[in-house]
Amino acid sequence: MLVVEGLTCRFGAKAAVDDASFQISPGGFVGVIGRSGAGKSTLLRTINRLVTPTQGRILFDGTDVTALRGKELRQWRARSAMIFQQFNLVGRLDVLTNVLMGRLATMPAWRSLSQTWPEHDKALAMSALEQFDIAALAAQRADQLSGGQQQRVAIARALVQQPDIILADEPIASLDPRNTKIVMDALLRINKHFGITVLCNLHSLDLARSYCDRLIGMAQGRVVFDGAPSALTDHVARELYDLEATDVMGGSPVPAPEGIPALGTAAAA
């Protein structure tokens, strides 16, 4: 189980993440939603420890992730695989080698420097590519692929890390609708087929409601909504994104339903 307790991350006087607390049970597909600048990316990077928190704790299966250093920290980063919007592939290398990069944390230094990959790791990487229908591209340079193909390579790289949790930081932000569906389906397959927990930053409310079994809403660095997609009413979404009804609904303004708590209240958490 992932437990986030009072997590705060400051850059100067600004709190990018401000006293965030929540728990995620194994096997969940959780979406993090909110406006740009709400703290979503910083939250995921702090969980992975790419960013050092100012205060608070991150626990995973009882281990204090915020206290990890050296080899143990590298092992945690392998267990909490990051998927980035920018793909972070090495363009001049072939697809298979890019996927094999996900195995570096398991290799001795001499193997990683020489990129001498064990046959078991090669088989694991090819299997991951097959999962996402891109095995035929294994020998192709990564910079010759489309954006959707590159993101699937990045997801395959995350899968070969054999992680406990995948942290996907706006993985579809630069993709067209067709590739958006392909990438989201790939993440859902990892979640359902392999039982890997997925924590995914998303801008689209429609996608968040369609793919996620739980949503965490952030505003100004704080968690202001935590619940099932069905609980994210249009009234709550308007408050979360500071939008007019027409921006959320795509139609005429409608009155807010009665009995819906304001964001940040106990009932909305």
Curated annotation (Swiss-Prot):
Family statement drawn from the similarity comment of this UniProt entry: Belongs to the ABC transporter superfamily. Phosphonates importer (TC 3.A.1.9.1) family.
Q: Name one GO molecular function term.
A: ATP hydrolysis activity
User: Protein name, please?
Assistant: Phosphonates import ATP-binding protein PhnC
Residue span(s) of domain ABC transporter: 2-245
UniProt cross-references to PANTHER family, sorted A to Z? AMINO ACID IMPORT ATP-BINDING PROTEIN (PTHR43166), PHOSPHONATES IMPORT ATP-BINDING PROTEIN PHNC (PTHR43166:SF6)
> Is Phosphoprotein set as a keyword in this record?
no
> Which superkingdom does the taxonomy of this entry point to?
Bacteria
